[in-house]
Amino acid sequence: PNLPKLHFEPEQPITTPVVKEVYGLEAANVMLGWRLPGANDKSTDISDIVGSILYNGQAGLIDLDLNQQQKVLSAYGYASTQPDYSSFLVAGRPKTGQSLDEVRDLLLAEVAKLRDGDFDENLIEATINNYKMQLMRSFEENDSRAILYVYSFISGADWADEVARIDRMSKITKQDIVDWANKYLGPESYAIVYKREGKDPNEQKIAAPKITPIVTNRDSQSEFLSEIQTSQVQPIEPVFVDYKKDMSQFEAQKGVNVLYKKNETNDIFTLIYVFNTGTENDPALNLAFDYLSYLGTDKMSAEQIASEMYAIACSFGLSAGANQSWIEVSGLSENMGKAMEIVEGLIAGAQPNEEILQNLKGDMIKSRADAKLNQSRCFGALQRYMIYGSDFIRRTTLTDPALQGLTSEQLLAKIGDLMGKQHEVLYYGPQDEAEVKAALAAHHKLAADLQPLEKKFSTLQPTDENKVMLAQYDAKQLYYMQYSNRGEKFDLAADPQITLYNEYFGGGMNTIVFQEMREARGLAYSAWANLAIPTNAKGDYYYMAFIATQNDKMQKAIEAFDEIINNMPESEKAF
């Protein structure tokens, strides 16, 4: 109650586009933004709906007109609320041979449709239904419940207004949206930032400041911490999962085992088909899944599928890992049957489209080239090479010529073949077992004799000798990782000690590694270390230590890291 209120000088209206450029090694992209009133303004309800009408990952204007039509490499948009001024942002990445100005014009054309009312009015109701579902899903977690209080506090909103938001949104009309868009999303009232590849011609050098190490005070406690620690609270009694009592299993048909857990919290369902095969078995699986998402059937176009799924507040996705693949359908439980019918119909009856496939191949090759310009992506590829070895990379990666040689028939056959394999079904939702079994029988049509798939796991590389692996990247900072695998197998009895060690030593911002490397010595932007627990009973433990730091601090950072790893600082209070 004694906190000062936020006061700020109002900004001058933007009457002509504000144009800025930034340069760097990463791939080119463009972002545009319009200034909106602060989070407490009554129009904020409209801005969030407009953001989802423009882009929602399924059936928004950008989704269907740009991404689904493959007119850009990728594009998105959203409203971002802040206490003083909020913003409405749209952004995109260019295809091969496409200029940033062309991407800009495509984005501006989609925003213009909001001003002109050139969108389906049904999107408003669908957006509100999806917003309700997202709230229900988020409220399954205490973090999300708490953060709503935090955002309300930060924006200075009355809590009664916060909880009545859905009621207000349900009264918003298409004309309200058109009026709002004309008021705030003017054709000239935006700022635009071009991210271009290359060296900044106006780059300015800043002298590196001298950093004086500080003595950590992890054994000291503030009055605030002491007050919290001495407060009386009701002890939390842990509840451990009993897989025989807390969930159930049944067989939908031979070769299809269902793991079932009833959702007692809300009306949201999640249904996942899990196949024990992935990119180690077939590196083209992800391309096949991506291709399918652009296709329609003889009854529904791809746009109709996306719009219908969004209208019933459901979604679906297909993805492949190294050793497992997933087909997931989720959303409002009352619409599960309809969603399953749409997804299963697409899987069984997708109509090939060679133009889409050629565009998809070109976009994948462009995305690969862009990834090579990104330091984090390059470092991630180096990590996989270090941990899994060159054979793993070859098995799980399509070369560009192999990618170009794949046909529609081959890709769709891969998905069809997958549905002829044994798999698990995971269900979490409000329906009872009998209803789930009936839904699977009605919509999950499979052959009577499914082929078995053996469960496999990726093999980690042992570290029999010291090696250094380097990926050159011309940047002012570096990413450094140590990896050690002595072949020690999973031991259930050691699990508590390992978890405790990781929490104390290197698992977060309040650990020895972060405090010593960043806070005390100023030698890293980020640092962590842990003993990784295997993901399967036959897997190996392996040790990993990571530093992100400036190039000129590398030697000192590595030496300090080795010192605290080999001679771990001890603090009884921190422990």
What are these regions (language model features)?
Residues 1-65, 77, 104, 193-308, ...:
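His/Glu-rich zincin catalytic helix
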Residues 27-38, 63-170, 191-195, 203-205, ...:
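M16 family metallopeptidases and their MPP-like homologs
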Residues 73-75, 174, 183, 247-251:
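Proteostasis/folding factors centered on peptidyl-prolyl cis-trans isomerases
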Residues 172-182, 408, 442:
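Charged, well-ordered internal alpha-helical segments
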Residues 172-175, 349-358, 406:
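Peptidyl-prolyl cis-trans isomerase
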Residues 176-195:
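Bilobed periplasmic-binding protein-like "clamshell/Venus-flytrap" ligand-binding domains
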Residues 403-406, 411:
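Alpha-helical scaffold elements lining the catalytic groove of polysaccharide deacetylases
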